[in-house]
Curated annotation (Swiss-Prot):
NCBIfam families: mutl. It comes from the Bacteria. The lineage of its organism: Bacteria, Thermotogati, Thermotogota, Thermotogae, Petrotogales. This is DNA mismatch repair protein MutL. One of its GO terms (molecular function) is ATP-dependent DNA damage sensor activity. It comes from Petrotoga mobilis (strain DSM 10674 / SJ95). Coiled coil: none annotated.
Length: 621
């Protein structure tokens, strides 16, 4: 007989794997239990990314001896007693799975005492079985220590990421709890206090603590309250954001959720004043009657379903727009705020036209010169070692990747760009390196108008310059082992959030290969050297973007994170709209000589219209 009943121990370990994916999920479950126990002071401590130790200590209502023993049994809970209770839920937990699952895959120590008791109870549990029980002197509340996570499931333990990566995931969880609860919350990692939030700290102060790159004026408070739904929180000014959505967080009834469509609803609220590729900061709280939202649709309770998705979406968009109108000086041109949005529909990021003027000074850029001196092929003597870059593992389930990097071995596919049959300009799919060219001028402060032998070309000079720089950087990295650095006369001091800072420090050697030399200060990163081959005007933004590239990278999906970082560097160094470029002939000749069709991110460098097409248009033939 091939079908057999699984051993109960196997069943429990499989079930535990649904709840406990790693140290961060353990921290999430334990802190939620503390909050459900009415704690207003919680301390979380981890060692080695939570692999060796996770300790959560609270001052909640505690548990008596009998309750403590029951709490580690499967499906035991104080939160619900009937299926109807699911639809009026006001607690984080309800399934009675967390402590049972955690206890079965770790060495656990639990100490708890209700305020009315003189002494507490301590249990030691090994793989789900109580091995010691005794009465102890303890403070009010509950302290749970988790040691050697997955010690009895080696296959699961080996899939944990590095200590630093797992520690980052825990840090992200702590930040979300800090946003949503007015409690005293302390977070200690490897004996170092990372965060200490007090119960009287307002949301903007928390944002500034978690995201030190922000200033108070960068944030706008939002508020709406009616009989069915309350929306509150903070969003950022339209010109303040990241190149991904890692600073957008949504909470429904104080529970952190990941509903993909809400991200697009937030950005739709900005309309056309949101700069292309900028994703705003947003800490959004939605309070709704419990019977209008189902939280029992995901093993880790990260997804929810609304009974009226359209009401929530329209209201959120309206609140964002009204707050922006009140707090910004931009011309607001929005579509109808009552347009329908399906929260269950999978969405992708979008970009909109920028309607405001940037007060950027024009700078002169000379394309006729190499990024620095003419002997750039000889001035690098550092070589890579063959060790892999650590910790650039998958975080794609947390963040979306906004573009696909150009791959030198592949031909660019123009199918992604939609050109109607009756359009006169078409993408350039083939380049004749011997063609004679004549530059006629610049239009719209960003396009070269070029006369070819049988055609007229429009060239995006930012895309062209970006690809030109990328090729030089890539040649130096792959043929000479890395980029040389120029030491800065005045080091750049950068305030980074804990997650970005951790990523940068973990990959310090990787950044040195990119020509970036840095040191750690207690609160900041100090950049002391930048690559010699390119001029970087905004080192802070470059560091932010490299950190984010590393954060969302995956070696399976993104074979070479180094190429992606070089593309980011080239983009930052390339000439921008409204700059005053010189040496355009040199740039154009290089593009044609090397037959470069796209920028490093895959966007076309030029489009064309043949003179024959023009003659037909004007009735000459």
């Amino acid at each position: 007989m091939r079908i057999k009943v699984l051993n109960p121990e196997v069943v429990m370990k499989i079930a535990a794997g649904e709840v406990v994916s790693g140290p961060s999920s353990v921290v999430k479950e334990l802190v939620e239990n503390s909050l459900d126990a009415q704690a207003d002071s919680i301390t979380v401590e981890i060692l080695d990314g939570g692999k060796s130790l996770i300790k959560v200590d609270d001052n909640g209502i505690g548990m008596e001896e009998e309750e403590l023993e029951l709490s580690i049994l499967p499906h035991t809970t104080s939160k619900i007693f009937s299926i109807e209770d699911l639809y009026k839920l006001k607690t984080f937990g309800f399934r009675g799975e967390a402590l049972s699952s955690i206890s079965r895959v770790s060495r656990m120590k639990m100490t708890s005492k209700p305020p009315e008791k003189e002494v507490g109870t301590m249990l030691e549990i090994l793989g789900g079985k109580i091995i010691e029980k005794k009465r102890v002197n303890s403070s009010n509340g509950t302290k749970i220590e988790i040691m050697d996570l997955f010690f009895n499931i080696p296959a699961r333990r080996k899939f944990l990421k590095s200590d630093s990566a797992e520690g980052r995931y825990v840090t992200e969880i702590i930040e979300k709890f800090a946003f949503t609860n007015n409690i005293n919350l302390t977070y200690i990692r490897d004996h170092k206090e990372i965060y200490k939030f007090s119960s009287d700290m307002d949301l903007i102060t928390k944002c500034l603590k978690i995201y030190p790159e922000l200033k108070r004026d960068d944030l706008i408070e939002i508020e709406h309250n009616d009989s069915l739904c309350k929306i509150s929180g903070v969003i950022s000014q339209p010109k303040v954001g990241r190149n991904n959505r890692t600073a957008q967080h949504f909470f429904v009834n104080n529970r952190y959720i990941k509903v993909a469509s809400l991200y697009s609803v937030l950005e739709t609220g900005y309309g056309e004043i949101l700069e292309k590729s900028i994703h705003p900061y947003g800490i959004i709280f939605i309070e709704i009657p419990p019977d209008m939202v189902d939280v029992n649709v995901h093993p880790q309770k990260l997804e929810v379903k609304f009974t009226d998705e359209q009401m929530v979406a329209s209201l959120l968009k309206k609140v964002v727009r009204e707050s922006l109108k009140k707090n910004t000086h931009f011309t607001m041109e929005f579509i109808n705020s009552n347009d329908t949005i399906d929260l269950n529909k999978k969405t992708s990021s979008f970009s909109v036209q920028n309607l405001y003027n940037k007060n950027e000074s024009s700078q002169k850029v000379d394309f006729s010169q190499n990024p620095t001196n003419t002997d750039y092929f000889e001035n690098t003597d550092e070589f890579f070692n063959n060790s892999e870059i650590e910790d650039l593992q998958e975080e794609q389930n947390h963040f979306d990747n906004s573009y696909k990097l150009y791959e030198p071995s592949k031909t660019f596919d123009f199918k992604g760009f939609e050109y109607q049959k009756n359009q006169t300009f078409t993408p350039v799919e083939k380049i004749n390196s011997l063609e004679k060219l004549r530059i006629l001028g610049i239009v719209a402060e960003r396009y070269l108008v070029v006369e070819g032998e049988d055609k007229l070309l429009l060239v995006d000079f930012h895309a062209a310059h970006e690809r030109y720089i990328y090729e030089i950087l890539r040649e130096n990295v792959y043929e000479k082992g890395g980029l040389t650095s120029d030491l800065l006369l005045t080091p750049v001091i950068i305030a980074l959030d804990e997650v970005r800072k951790g990523i940068i420090l973990e990959n310090k050697d990787h950044l040195e290969k990119l020509g970036i030399k840095l040191e750690e200060d207690e609160k900041e990163i100090i950049v002391k050297g930048l690559p010699s081959l390119v001029k970087i005007d905004d080192a802070e933004r470059l560091i932010f973007e490299i950190a984010d590239d590393l954060r969302i990278s995956n070696f399976d999906q993104q074979p070479n994170i180094l190429d992606k970082n070089l593309a980011t560097m080239a983009c930052r160094a390339a000439v921008k709209t409204r700059d005053n470029p010189t040496g355009m002939e040199t740039l154009l000749n290089t593009i044609f000589e090397k037959k470069l069709l796209t920028c490093p991110h895959g966007r076309p460098i030029m489009i064309q219209i043949t003179f024959k097409t023009l003659d037909k248009y004007f009735g000459r033939i």
